[in-house]
């Protein structure tokens, strides 16, 4: 009983009181930045995670059919409500039109300029995502924005010519809607991907589709993301469904984003583990060899306390052993205070 309990009427005040309750040992906070900051300031040990704004770079060397299939599947999974789902397609110019055609063949709708403006006005409210669109079908997003697409539509695509406050669809939007950015080569793709991450997804997740190992390595090494999903669906890959990552919906973003860990946070992070350690092998011989290596590099003798040849504190015994002070007499007691 009581393995899982919930607040009946969650409010900011009740959540804060729960975090500070004397029986709470550790907090796992998954939500907006305000909730995470509240957890960190509660005075209790806390794991917090950050928001995502996931760029998906498609290189000229990519298998376009497989890349399109991965993106559509990822966007269809829970209607792109996971914070690790793709938010922007960053397309290498030589393959941009062909990739969009592959997406259209899988039910994607490329918005016209007029439709894009309607999406910008409807989905972005003062720099924040319109909460009414979270997790709804693409055709419903279009309908509420003021235009029509078939109910079979899998994802909406809308061009953006930059990243930032002046580009309303470059924020995190948790429904099957992707901004589209066309770039000139993988170096330019790196630049735009970094902009996306710094604009709201620092340390979280990104994906890359390429067969060129040099391109993959550049993204693996240069991007400020804790999870980089290669040649697969970002949403399902980052949470460990289609990859070997630890299964989790709470994805740490690391110190760069103010989080204590970049791990996929699991039950293991919530378990207090005690470790018992015994010596392995001849530790004294390992110590001697380590000191010898250090001495060969520095010219110094054996350190004081090593009790090895050359230790300045090592001396022969002289005179009788010192007497130890007598232990104080103990008066036995029994429960209740009786002395006997």
Where are these regions (language model features)?
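Short, structured coil segments at secondary-structure junctions
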Residues: 22-23, 42-43, 223-224
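ALDH superfamily catalytic-core signature
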Residues: 36-164
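Short acidic loop-to-helix transition motifs that present clustered carboxylates
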Residues: 8-14, 31-35, 212-213, 237
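Short, surface-exposed connector motifs at secondary-structure boundaries
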Residues: 1, 17-24, 197-203
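Short hydrophobic/charged patches on amphipathic alpha-helices used for structural packing
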Residues: 15-16, 68, 190
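Conserved C-terminal structural/oligomerization subdomain of aldehyde/semialdehyde dehydrogenase
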Residues: 147-340
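PLP-dependent aminotransferase-like
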Residues: 1-8
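Buried hydrophobic positions in well-ordered alpha/beta secondary-structure cores of metabolic enzymes
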Residues: 4, 27-28, 52, 92, ...
């Amino acid at each position: 009983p009581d393995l899982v309990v919930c607040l009946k009427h969650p409010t900011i005040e009740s959540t804060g009181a729960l975090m500070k309750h004397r029986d709470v040992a550790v907090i796992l906070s998954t939500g907006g930045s305000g909730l995470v900051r509240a957890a960190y300031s509660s005075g209790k040990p806390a794991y917090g995670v950050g928001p995502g704004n996931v760029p998906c770079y498609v290189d000229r060397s990519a298998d376009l059919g497989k890349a399109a299939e991965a993106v559509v599947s990822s966007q269809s999974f829970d209607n792109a409500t996971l914070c690790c789902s793709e938010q922007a397609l960053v397309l290498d110019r030589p393959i941009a039109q062909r990739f969009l055609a592959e997406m259209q063949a899988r039910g994607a709708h490329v918005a016209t300029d007029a439709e894009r403006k309607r999406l910008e006005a409807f989905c972005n409210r003062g720099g924040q995502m319109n909460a009414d669109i979270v997790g709804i079908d693409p055709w419903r997003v279009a309908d509420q924005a003021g235009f029509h697409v078939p109910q079979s539509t899998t994802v909406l695509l809308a061009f953006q010519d930059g990243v930032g406050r002046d580009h309303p669809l470059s924020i995190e939007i948790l429904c099957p809607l992707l901004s589209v950015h066309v770039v000139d080569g993988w170096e330019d793709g790196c630049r735009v991907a970094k902009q996306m991450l710094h604009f709201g997804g620092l340390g979280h997740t990104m994906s890359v589709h390429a067969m060129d190992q040099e391109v993959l390595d550049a993204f693996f090494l240069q991007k400020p993301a804790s999870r980089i999903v290669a040649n697969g669906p970002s949403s399902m890959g980052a949470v460990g469904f289609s990859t070997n990552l630890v299964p989790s919906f709470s994805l740490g973003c690391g110190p760069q984003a103010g989080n204590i860990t970049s791990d996929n946070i699991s039950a293991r992070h919530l378990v207090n583990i005690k470790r018992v350690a015994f010596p392995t092998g001849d530790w004294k011989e390992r110590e001697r060899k380590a000191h010898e290596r250090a001495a060969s590099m520095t010219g110094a003798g054996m350190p004081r306390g090593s009790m090895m040849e050359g230790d300045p504190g090592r001396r022969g015994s002289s005179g009788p052993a010192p007497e130890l002070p007598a232990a104080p007499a103990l008066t036995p007691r029994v429960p209740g205070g009786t002395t006997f």
